[in-house]
Swiss-Prot record:
CDD domains: PBP1_PrnA-like. It comes from Borreliella afzelii (strain PKo). This is Basic membrane protein B. GO terms for cellular component: plasma membrane. It holds the Pfam family Bmp. Its main location: membrane. PROSITE patterns: PROKAR_LIPOPROTEIN (PS51257). Residues 1-14 form the signal peptide. PANTHER family: ABC TRANSPORTER GUANOSINE-BINDING PROTEIN NUPN (PTHR34296:SF2), TRANSCRIPTIONAL ACTIVATOR PROTEIN MED (PTHR34296). SUPFAM superfamilies: Periplasmic binding protein-like I. Belongs to the BMP lipoprotein family. Keywords: Cell inner membrane, Cell membrane, Lipoprotein, Membrane, Palmitate, Signal, Transport.
């Protein structure tokens, strides 16, 4: 697994904010550090698309630089971020929860540089540095809709979930999905497992085939690149075996087997926050965690218009009439208090 770094130098005509870009400077370099492979057909691909949009909308003096390191190794993250600092980056995006710890340390050590991080996981007592913005997604809201659809569509009344590495983010997919399914059909049977990898396609394929062989006819996965294995399993089996994807619309990989994808539009969030900063004299409103969900249009289903019957559910979630669980504790409360199971 590798880390790709993109550097974009963007020519601006105004002076820059207090966070380290010298007044009178004419351009800023925007960098992105991605945990994992860039073209994962999912989470990281969405972030990369945002950079391509920035490149298109701010085309002057753009340069692209690649680097790589071993995923999950803290010292490698630090080394790559030091290189970005030496290259003159004024804004650095970190994509992936594995980069949460290093995001805090580098932002504290380099107050002159602005940072953003996608999907950070911090303790409740952590104070976010003023030059750091964290973006988290209420992905459980989209997964709830997917689970509801899966339960309605399943012929066998057996559905599955395959996650990558167990953690807060993957669990949000899982428990949102399970809650939505139970909301649609209290008697639905749900099997949830983890591949313990975001990149091992073969393991995910084996797990999917095992589930399908036991009568499960729909599998939702949230496993990064490994999810391709689930898609391949359904495609090879043919009619009657379905998948629900994650992060991006992946239906082109198996059009006849896809029901929908739970969209976490990392790209839209990254683009929105960055472009607003660029348009506002490079002011970076850090020191906070920004939550985005159905209400913001960055979480949902890839083909929501095909499922008119979920519109009322969307409204109830947005209006907080339905509080979707994102973890096991919340799910158990949901089952007992809402569904009376």
């Amino acid at each position: 697994m590798r880390i790709a770094i993109f550097i974009f130098g963007i020519l601006l005509t105004s002076c820059f904010s207090k966070n380290g870009i010298e007044s009178g400077s004419s351009k800023i370099k925007i960098s992105m550090l991605v945990d994992g492979v860039l073209d994962d057909k999912s989470f990281n691909s969405s972030a990369n698309e945002a950079l391509l949009r920035l490149k298109k909308d701010f085309p002057e003096n753009i340069e692209k630089v690649f680097s790589s390191a071993v995923s999950g190794v803290y010292s490698s993250y630090v080394s790559d971020l030091d290189n970005l600092k030496m290259n003159g980056s004024g804004l650095i995006w970190l994509v992936g929860y594995m980069l949460a710890d290093v995001s805090l340390s580098v932002s504290l050590e380099n107050p002159e540089i602005n940072y953003g991080i996608i999907d950070p996981i911090y303790g409740d007592d952590v104070q976010i540095p003023k030059n750091l913005i964290g973006v988290v997604f209420r992905i459980e809201q989209g997964a709830f809709l997917a689970g509801y659809i899966a339960a309605k569509k399943s012929v066998s009344s057996k559905i599955g979930f395959i996650g990558g590495v167990k953690g807060d983010i993957v669990d949000a997919f899982r428990y949102g999905y399970e809650a939505g399914a139970k909301y649609a059909n209290k008697g639905i049977e749900i099997v949830s497992e983890y591949s313990n990898s975001f990149s091992d396609i073969d393991i995910a394929r084996v797990m999917a085939n095992k589930m399908y062989s036991k009568g499960i006819d729909i599998i939702h996965f949230a496993a990064g690149l490994a999810g391709v294995g689930v898609i391949e399993a359904a495609k090879e089996l043919g009619d009657g075996y379905y998948v629900i994807g994650a992060d991006q619309d992946q239906s082109h990989l198996a059009p006849k087997n896809f029901i929908t994808s739970v969209i976490k539009n990392v790209g839209d969030a990254l683009y929105l926050i960055t472009s607003e900063s660029l348009k506002n004299d490079n002011v970076w409103e850090g020191g906070k965690i920004v939550q985005m969900g159905l209400r913001d249009g960055v979480v949902g289903l890839s083909n929501a218009n095909e499922f008119e019957y979920i519109k009322d559910l969307e409204r109830k979630i947005i209006n907080k009439e339905i509080i979707v669980p994102c973890n096991q504790e919340g799910y158990e409360i949901f089952i007992k208090q809402i569904l009376k199971l």
